[in-house]
Amino acid sequence: YRADCITDMALEFFDQYDGKKPFFMTISQIEPHHQNDRGHYEGPEGSKEKYKNFVLPHDLEMLQGNAAEEYPDYLGQCASLDKNLGRLVERLKKEGLYDNTVIIFASDHGSHFKTRNTDSHLNGYDDYKRTCHDGALHVPLVIAGGPYKGGAAVKELVSTESLPKTILALAGVDVGDAMIGENLLDVAEKKTDN
C-alpha cells in the first residue's frame, strides 16, 4: 500500500543516520485522499469489509454525496496512516531518538465526499478546499514532543502558515515579525493575544 511504501523509504534514513547532527524529516503521505485519476478512495485491501459497519458522521449522512460508498475505504486509509505513524514512533524509540524529537502531524484539508461545491468554473472539480465548510477549516494539526507536552487542545483557529515560524523556533531561531504566522507554542501556552 502506498502509505507503507512511503514510510518504508522514510525509515531507511535511520539505517545510515549516525546521530551526530540533528535531523529534519518531512514525510508527505497522500492518504486519506481520493485517487485523483479514479475519483474515489482506495483503502488498503479489506477496508470495505472491515469498516463497512461504521456509522457515517451526521453531517455526511444527511447530505447527498458518495460518503456511504467511500467511507469504509477512507477509514482504511486513516487506519493505514495511524499504523505507519506508529512504525515511525517505534523506530525513533528503538534508535533512542524519540524523547528528543518533535513530531508535527498536519493536513491541508479534509473531505466532504462530494456533498457540496462542484462548480462549473472548475470543470466539475470540487471547490471544497477553498470554502468555509468544516472539511476545509477543521483539519488535523498535532504537535508532540520537545516543549509540546501535556496534551493541551487549542480551541482557537490556527493556520499551517505558522508552521515554518514554529519549526524555526524549535531550532532556536527567532524570526520575530519577519515571517507571517505565530510560534504555535506561544498559542498553546496562551502567551499571545492573536
Protein language model annotation of sequence segments:
Residues Q64-C78, D126-K129, P147-V158, A171-V175:
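Active-site rim elements
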Residues P44-E69, G124-D127:
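Aromatic- and acidic-residue-enriched carbohydrate-binding clefts of CAZyme catalytic domains
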Residues D37-G46, K93-A152, S159:
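Histidine-centered active-site microenvironments of extracellular/periplasmic hydrolases
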Residues R2, Q29-H34, H109-H112, Y148-K149, ...:
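Short, solvent-exposed loop/turn segments at secondary-structure junctions
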Residues D4-D8, P72, G76-G86, A136-L137, ...:
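A structural signal for well-ordered alpha-helical segments within the folded catalytic domains
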Residues S111-L122, K149, S162-P164, A169-N194:
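C-terminal cap/loop subdomain of S1 sulfatases and analogous C-terminal strand-loop tails that border
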